[in-house]
């Protein structure tokens, strides 16, 4: 005889109800990958009609899949007026993007294991670094892994970091540190802030100057409010100095081009001055300015595919080989 009949009865009732709950949840979450794919298309293309065109289907099909997903989850995922995801929709979209990335990684891994490393790898890169890194990187990828399809995206750190986080990019070379907590960062190199001076300017040939000397001359700068400019202004303000702007140019590559064409000296990150042919200009190092760090970021919540790992290894090798020969760049990548 059961010495605890009441307890046994309660346990049996709880177990029965728990099994019923599990069955109900499982049956209500009959979502499929097509529903998630259609939801992502609506969010990324910002309308049902644009999503339908991207998916090569009719709008009613997209609407049906999204509506079924909303019914199964018991909540609205897309606000039909603003066409923006709701709070619940954002949560689903974040996970759906990771699922999409993992599914593509599965296919790429199997192909790479059976044959050669193959598949598409999406690489973001800040423009200043891309100027001298892109050509050797793409060349080395082609030599080592001809079946790889690299896609290179040139943009700013503030644009690239979120795209790595949401799965649009597999990795990105950006200025660090980044604020996104979901990103994993690997240091690549630090770069000095350097002056490019026309050959006939008093700074030309100086080799190295201090902050006081820099403040005596009018130089081209990025605008106030940009990360690069604000960091420099803070450092000079800390020692009681202020820069004189000959012009403010919103774009480091344009700023470098103007300096090389002889308009005026420009204060630039070292990677922005790499790759230009020699001419009637001079590079001047500045003592007292902190270096700017550059690193490789990837989403820490996903497992990189074999093509992504192969691309990362090639990128590391290119940095180790090429970066030490660029003026003002100091490799921080581990051996």
Q: Which ranges hold each PLM region?
A:
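Short helix-boundary/capping micro-motifs
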Residues: 40-58
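A short LG(V/I)-centered, amphipathic sequence patch enriched
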Residues: 70-87
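Alpha-helical linker/hinge and terminal dimerization helices associated
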Residues: 72-73, 92-114
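Flexible hinge/capping segments at coil-to-helix
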Residues: 180-219
